């Protein structure tokens, strides 16, 4: 087995270092897994990860968000809780963000070059601002809105 020293491998190493330096396990683990996959026999599975990775990630994220409700750590509010302005605002924001993310997916497919910018912005946000890497979908939706694609 020989190492493939290319631009992508270098980027993954830089991300790995940034993840360690910024104490961000999400970036560190993601970059390490992808670097290992790229440099080994697992590279044949990268297209599968590319095709289903976001969907699987969203499923896992949704399970993580819903699990406190299922475990009983978070209780459903009574009817008056649903009628408060904070609940109405939170539902509205949830709808807006989901709609924006849905509009971002087609933009990412139509103009894949923009994905690079979105990823760089997401990496900066995760590595240095304590963000979470669900940003590309929402960022693409906001970008689609700004570009007049919506």
Curated annotation (Swiss-Prot):
Its main location: membrane. InterPro entries: UPF0756_TM (IPR007382). Keywords: Cell membrane, Membrane, Transmembrane, Transmembrane helix. It is found in: Cell membrane. The chain crosses the membrane at residues 1-21, 52-72, 81-101, 123-143. Pfam families: DUF441. One of its GO terms (cellular component) is plasma membrane. It is a multi-pass membrane protein. The keyword Mitochondrion does not apply. Belongs to the UPF0756 family. This is UPF0756 membrane protein HI_1074. It comes from Haemophilus influenzae (strain ATCC 51907 / DSM 11121 / KW20 / Rd). The lineage of its organism: Bacteria, Pseudomonadati, Pseudomonadota, Gammaproteobacteria, Pasteurellales.
């Amino acid at each position: 087995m020989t190492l493939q020293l290319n631009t992508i491998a270098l980027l993954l190493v830089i991300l790995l270092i940034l993840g360690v330096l910024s104490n961000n396990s999400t970036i560190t683990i993601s970059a390490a897994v992808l670097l290992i996959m790229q440099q080994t026999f697992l590279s044949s599975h990268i297209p599968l990860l590319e095709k289903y990775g976001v969907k699987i990630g969203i499923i896992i994220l949704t399970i993580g968000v819903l699990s406190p409700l299922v475990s009983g750590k978070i209780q459903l509010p009574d009817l008056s809780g649903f009628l408060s302005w904070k609940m109405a605002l939170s539902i509205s924001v949830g709808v807006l963000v989901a709609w924006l993310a849905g509009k971002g997916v087609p933009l990412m497919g139509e103009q894949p070059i923009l994905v690079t910018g979105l990823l760089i912005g997401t990496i900066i946000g995760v590595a240095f601002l304590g963000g979470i890497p669900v940003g590309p979908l929402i960022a693409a939706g906001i970008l689609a809105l700004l570009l007049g694609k919506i």
